């Protein structure tokens, strides 16, 4: 059986550790580093600085120089900025809005007739709000004034008036457009228009039809409008056919 020797002779070889000493700077040891980087801020009493210094010295001993890491200076040239192309889109032509026709003022209790006159009417609270016909007038102001006088008589100071500042001025009543006046005006207009055409039969027929239409319209707003048709029976007699 093999036995280990009781005593073993161990031989220790002293390890050689590089010890670096420096003066005020390391420029005497590595002048190339000093030329490139200047004096390195390494401290002798700092173990980490000494390790870095050892790596640098070993690399320097095998031929490494700081010039291998120096990058060539690149000349910076000004970059030409490309301006965005101007858009040449053509905006659509703007169409000017059509001039609005000026509308007349709307008065309370006033309606305009198809032939241009203005009718005034009011609802009577004493008759469960029934519509009361006040008349037809030449202008909207006259019809509005007639409505105001009637409303003031019915409701007093609670009435909503078109011209409240004109109440109590003792103004004359607005002139109504009566049936006779309308008939005379329409007849004269019909005669003038027919005289231009030069046909006496058409003139008499137009006057009679216009008179019949005005008679129906003058009976009030609740009367149904009717039509009429005229037939000539003799040289001076006419037959009028009226239907609803």
From Swiss-Prot:
Question: Pfam families recorded for this chain?
Answer: AP2
Entry-linked InterPro entries: AP2/ERF_dom, AP2/ERF_dom_sf, DNA-bd_dom_sf, ERF_plant
Q: Spell out the SMART domains in the cross-references.
A: AP2
Cellular compartment(s):
Nucleus
Q: Which GO terms describe its biological process?
A: defense response; ethylene-activated signaling pathway; fruit ripening
Entry keywords, A to Z? Activator, DNA-binding, Ethylene signaling pathway, Fruit ripening, Nucleus, Plant defense, Transcription, Transcription regulation
Tissues with expression: Present in stems.
User: Where DNA binds (residue ranges)?
Assistant: 106-164
Q: Where is this region: Disordered?
A: 186-214
Cellular-component GO terms for this entry: nucleus
Q: Specify the inducers.
A: Strong induction by ethylene and by wounding.
The signal sequence is none
Q: What SUPFAM superfamilies does this protein map onto?
A: DNA-binding domain
Q: Which GO terms describe its molecular function?
A: DNA binding; DNA-binding transcription factor activity
Low complexity bias locations: 186-198
Q: What does this protein do?
A: Involved in the regulation of gene expression during fruit ripening, by stress factors and by components of stress signal transduction pathways. Transcription factor that binds to the GCC-box pathogenesis-related promoter element. Probably acts as a transcriptional activator and may be involved in disease resistance pathways.
User: Any notes on this protein's domains?
Assistant: The AP2/ERF domain binds specifically to the 5'-GCCGCC-3' motif. The affinity of this binding is higher if the seventh amino-acid of this domain is basic.
Indicate the family of this protein: Belongs to the ethylene-response factor family. Class 1 subfamily.
The molecule here is called Ethylene-responsive transcription factor 1
Q: Which species is this record about?
A: Solanum lycopersicum (Tomato)
Upper lineage? Eukaryota, Viridiplantae, Streptophyta, Embryophyta, Tracheophyta
């Amino acid at each position: 059986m093999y036995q280990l020797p009781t005593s073993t002779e161990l031989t220790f070889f002293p390890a050689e550790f590089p010890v670096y000493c420096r003066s005020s700077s390391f420029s005497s040891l590595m002048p190339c580093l000093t030329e490139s980087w200047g004096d390195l801020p390494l401290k002798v009493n700092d173990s980490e600085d000494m390790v870095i210094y050892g790596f640098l010295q070993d690399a320097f001993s095998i031929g490494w120089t700081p010039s291998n890491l120096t990058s060539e200076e690149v000349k910076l040239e000004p970059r030409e900025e490309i301006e965005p192309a101007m858009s040449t889109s053509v905006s659509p032509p703007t169409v000017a809005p059509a001039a609005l026709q000026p509308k007349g003022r709307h008065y309370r209790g006033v309606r305009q007739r198809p032939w241009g006159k203005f009718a005034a009417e009011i609802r009577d609270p004493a008759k469960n709000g029934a519509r009361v016909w006040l008349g037809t007038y030449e202008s909207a102001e006259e019809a509005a004034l007639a409505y105001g006088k009637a409303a003031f008589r019915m409701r007093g100071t609670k009435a909503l008036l078109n011209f409240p500042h004109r109440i109590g001025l003792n103004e004359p009543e607005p002139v109504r457009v009566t049936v006779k006046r309308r008939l005379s005006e329409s007849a004269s207009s019909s005669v003038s228009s027919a005289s231009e055409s030069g046909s006496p039969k058409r003139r008499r027929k137009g006057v009679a039809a216009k008179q019949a239409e005005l008679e129906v319209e003058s009976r009030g707003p609740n009367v149904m409008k009717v039509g009429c048709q005229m037939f000539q029976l003799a040289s001076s007699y006419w037959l009028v056919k009226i239907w609803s």
